[in-house]
Amino acid sequence: MALFPTLSHTHSYPKVEENWNTIISDMQSGKENRTQVWAFPKRTISVNLPGHIYADLKLIRDFYNNTCKGARYTFRFKYDQSRAYAKEYAGLGDSTTKTFTIPSIDASSNITAYVNDVVTGTSFGDGTGSDGLDQMTFASAPANGSVVTVSFTGKWTPQVRFPDKLSWQQITSLVSLTEQISLIEVRD
């Protein structure tokens, strides 16, 4: 899986919008009935791009068109700064898989893994996953359907996709883009 291109200008810390997809129905009594659809939020990451040079914008445009084909193929977006994250989704148990990818690069080896919200011991693999992502390995595979999450300190590297449509504007041989690009988090 590809990694979002490294730009010559470091972008400021992206804005993250979380969506829980809660269905809210007004009852006849005036009360609300609320149903949570997702177990974890789906996030939209807004990457700021003001003042980028032509080479950076062309790199993003080529990545969007040639590598990702719009929204078709997912990729990883790596935050520039290391931060602490709590109970990030890592996958679902299937009774056979012992190794799970942590949505992080350069995490400290001090991680806490959870299976259905119960702390479970693992071994840590720094950069041993695909695309240099960190991994954790359980002594025995989590049960089928169990939710695997992880708390860590590192550079959050979620799997994302582009929206299917981006607006570009040609201005005297310079490519300019709207002030930001929205990247939509994806889970397999």
What are these regions (language model features)?
Residues 44, 97-99, 131-135:
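A generic structural signal for beta-strand entry/edge sites
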Residues 34-35, 89, 138-140:
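Beta-strand-rich interaction surfaces with strong enrichment in secreted/lumenal proteins
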Residues 4-5, 10-11, 15, 110-151:
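Polar, enzyme-active/binding microenvironments
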Residues 60-126, 153-188:
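Extended beta-strand solenoid/passenger and fiber regions
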Residues 1-64, 155-176:
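Solvent-exposed edge beta-strands and adjacent loop segments
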Residues 50-51, 105-106, 137-144, 186-187:
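Secondary-structure transition/turn motif
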